[in-house]
């Protein structure tokens, strides 16, 4: 750990202006971003008596090796710049509002030509409208009911494409649960109108649709069209069934998000209820680990930044009112920022009495329950992860804790399309943002050991180069200027070395990895190999493997890392192999570039289907005219068909 005194700036050097500051570790990686009205006052607090610091703050200042700051013109600029840098650098010690993944969302993919309704979890996507979260059962029941009135497609892209090619709809089309845009029963514009109406109903306009249907039902009765009137009656009943599931909790013209916080010394649980047209339309939850001793008002400030600042969220994500337990100190700047994002006035208020205050109490109760659930789950997960990492450290006789593990795997078929994967685990948790893929060509692709030597050399050579570049940058004079934009420096790919390298294989792969590190002069990274057959752990230059008990949590962690590296490598290999197969068949066709080759493969779904297509089918692909289609067909016919073989058994799958 670094000594904070070694990089503490002199008090007189720190300005008293508002600004944003960044702590960096020994590898130059940003580990914490914060803002302050008075930079001098805030930064000196980090270098106070260590006894007064929270455990995570203590860890942060002792992990950091430098601190920098940028002066801005106002608190609003500081708010915007802090948010931008947190999104760009993803600092490990900043508050990370992790969604409660217990419940999924009902999503409508409005960004597609033919929007579809589906259940989604995880990260939000641009161009998609989200409603919820709800229980999976509630979503299924809601969708099944609403498709009677708004028959939007729910099928997967592959099912939709098959229906387009065959001219026959799927089962949902035959039972009137889909408008069947795949075969042209409705146009793209008509189908989009249905999707818009579906979203409007879910967004709180249910009474308008029910009223319209009741009016149409009365007109049908007046015209003696009783069959149509009966259908409309059933639609009204279906919509009322969905509408009445959400009890009215506030006045019908109320659009608000209601936040509550429950915290202890180290963590905080946040809950929000989304109220639209007076009804609860969704609920979300987060749990955060605190770096500083933040009061609820400061937590709310960070929360509003992350919830409403995400550009990928849907356009109506910000309501007219935001109800919070305490007002942030910079409520005026937050209100101005949120009003600018919404394009209309936003109010941030603390409910004092009445229905809103009562609902706030309910949200607070949910936050308290969420904290209890989180702690019970985390206790089990953290115990298992800590046990696994400690078992590995003891079994391998390593001097330092395993903060970061990297695992490498090679994938190919008979030496062709050789690729490698690198997966990363930090504190026992996969860090997918730092996964890497490698293409291996030339002499390095002759066998697995040469490939492993090549990959390890490339990864750590890049690390050494980036370390050298950062060292040179730190020797240059640093000037702190007023700034209104985020840093534009590119993100580092390999700036953080592992404590342990795991390779998929036995002594040959381990020896190749150790040789690559030794040739680069790297001696502080441990290397092991995990052999598949008996799950033996091999160390460099050892004649006998380390055998971990079958019930060992450490072995289980190694197996999961190895299997994840294998999965990641195979997926890249299949992708590369598919591209090479298409290219080898279609190379040399005049006028057929890479983009048109991709369009052909995307349209037909596989090389086999492309080979069986005739000229008229090929010419249906956008950008492929009759002449070019004829040339493609000729190129395909000139290739002698090779039988597909199961490489594990030698069986010929097709002739």
From Swiss-Prot:
GO CC annotation: cytoplasm; excinuclease repair complex
Disulphide bonds in the chain: none
Annotated InterPro entries: GIY-YIG_endonuc (IPR000305), GIY-YIG_endonuc_sf (IPR035901), GIY-YIG_UvrC_Cho (IPR047296), Hlx-hairpin-Hlx_DNA-bd_motif (IPR003583), RuvA_2-like (IPR010994), UVR_dom (IPR001943), UVR_dom_sf (IPR036876), UvrABC_protein_C (IPR050066)
A molecular-function term among this protein's GO annotations: excinuclease ABC activity
CDD domains tied to this protein: GIY-YIG_UvrC_Cho
UniProt KW Transport keyword: no
Pfam families reported for this sequence: GIY-YIG, HHH_5, UVR, UvrC_RNaseH, UvrC_RNaseH_dom
GO biological process: nucleotide-excision repair; SOS response
UVR domain sequence ranges: 207-242
Stretches assigned to the GIY-YIG domain: 16-95
Domain of life according to the entry: Bacteria
Location of this chain's protein in the cell: Cytoplasm
Keyword Cytoplasm: yes
Segment forming the signal sequence: none
Function: The UvrABC repair system catalyzes the recognition and processing of DNA lesions. UvrC both incises the 5' and 3' sides of the lesion. The N-terminal half is responsible for the 3' incision and the C-terminal half is responsible for the 5' incision.
Family to which the UniProt record says this protein belongs: Belongs to the UvrC family.
Subunit structure as annotated in this protein's UniProt entry: Interacts with UvrB in an incision complex.
Protein name: UvrABC system protein C
Gene behind this protein: uvrC
């Amino acid at each position: 750990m670094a000594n904070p005194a070694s990089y503490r700036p002199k008090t007189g050097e720190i300005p008293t202006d508002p600004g944003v500051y960044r702590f960096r570790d020994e590898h130059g990686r940003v580990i914490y971003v914060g803002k302050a009205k008075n930079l001098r006052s805030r930064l000196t607090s980090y270098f106070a008596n260590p006894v007064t610091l929270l455990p995570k703050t203590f860890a942060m200042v002792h992990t950091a090796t430098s601190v920098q700051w940028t002066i801005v013109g106002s608190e609003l600029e500081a708010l915007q710049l802090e948010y931008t840098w947190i999104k760009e650098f993803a600092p490990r010690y900043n508050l990370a509002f992790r969604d409660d993944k217990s419940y999924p969302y009902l999503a409508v993919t409005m960004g597609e030509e033919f929007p579809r309704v589906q259940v989604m979890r995880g990260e939000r996507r641009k161009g998609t409208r989200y409603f919820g979260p709800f229980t999976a059962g509630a979503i299924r029941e809601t969708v099944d009911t609403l498709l009677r009135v708004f028959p939007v497609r729910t099928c997967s892209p592959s099912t939709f494409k098959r229906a387009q090619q065959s001219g026959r709809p799927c089962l949902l089309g035959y039972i009137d649960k889909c408008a069947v845009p795949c075969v042209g029963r409705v146009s793209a514009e008509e189908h989009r109108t249905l999707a818009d109406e579906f979203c409007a109903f879910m967004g709180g306009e249910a009474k308008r649709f029910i009223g319209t249907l009741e009016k149409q039902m009365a007109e049908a009765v007046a015209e003696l069209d009783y069959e149509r009137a009966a259908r409309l009656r059933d639609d009204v009943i279906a919509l009322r069934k969905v509408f009445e599931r959400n009890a009215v909790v506030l006045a019908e013209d109320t659009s608000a998000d209601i936040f509550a916080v429950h915290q202890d010394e180290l963590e905080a649980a946040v809950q929000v209820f989304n109220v639209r047209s007076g009804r609860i339309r969704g609920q979300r939850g987060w749990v955060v680990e605190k770096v500083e001793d933040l009061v609820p008002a400061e937590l709310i400030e960070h929360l509003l930044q992350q919830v409403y600042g995400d550009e990928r969220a849907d356009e109506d994500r910000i309501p007219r009112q935001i109800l919070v337990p305490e007002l942030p100190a910079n409520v005026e700047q937050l209100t101005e920022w949120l009003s600018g994002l919404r394009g209309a006035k936003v109010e941030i208020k603390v409910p004092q009495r009445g229905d809103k205050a009562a609902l706030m109490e309910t949200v607070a109760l949910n936050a308290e329950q969420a904290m209890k659930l989180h702690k019970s789950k985390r206790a089990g997960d953290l115990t298992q992860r800590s046990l696994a990492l400690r078992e590995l450290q003891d079994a391998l006789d390593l001097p330092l804790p395993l903060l970061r593990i990297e695992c490498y795997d090679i994938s190919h078929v008979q030496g062709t399309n050789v690729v490698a994967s690198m997966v990363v685990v930090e504190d026992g948790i996969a860090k997918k943002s730092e996964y890497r893929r490698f293409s291996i060509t030339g002499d390095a692709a002759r066998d697995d050991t040469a490939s492993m030597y090549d990959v390890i050399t490339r990864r750590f050579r890049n690390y050494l180069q980036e370390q050298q570049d950062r060292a040179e940058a730190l020797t240059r004079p640093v000037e702190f200027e007023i700034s209104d934009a985020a840093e534009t420096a590119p993100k580092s790919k390999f700036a953080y070395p592992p404590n342990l390298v795991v390779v998929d294989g036995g002594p040959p792969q381990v020896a190749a990895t150790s040789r690559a590190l030794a040739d680069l002069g790297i001696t502080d990274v441990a290397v092991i190999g995990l052999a598949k057959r008996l799950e033996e752990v091999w160390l460099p230059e050892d004649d006998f493997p380390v055998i971990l008990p079958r019930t060992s949590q450490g072995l289980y962690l190694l197996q999961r890392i190895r299997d994840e590296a294998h999965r990641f490598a195979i997926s890249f290999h299949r992708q590369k192999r598919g591209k090479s197969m298409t290219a080898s068949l279609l190379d040399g066709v005049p006028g057929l570039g890479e983009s048109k080759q991709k369009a052909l493969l995307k349209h037909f779904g596989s090389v086999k289907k492309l080979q069986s297509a005739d000229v008229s089918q090929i010419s249906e692909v956008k950008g492929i005219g009759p002449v070019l289609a004829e040339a493609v067909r000729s190129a395909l016919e000139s290739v002698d068909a090779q039988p597909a073989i199961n490489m594990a058994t030698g069986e010929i799958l097709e002739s």
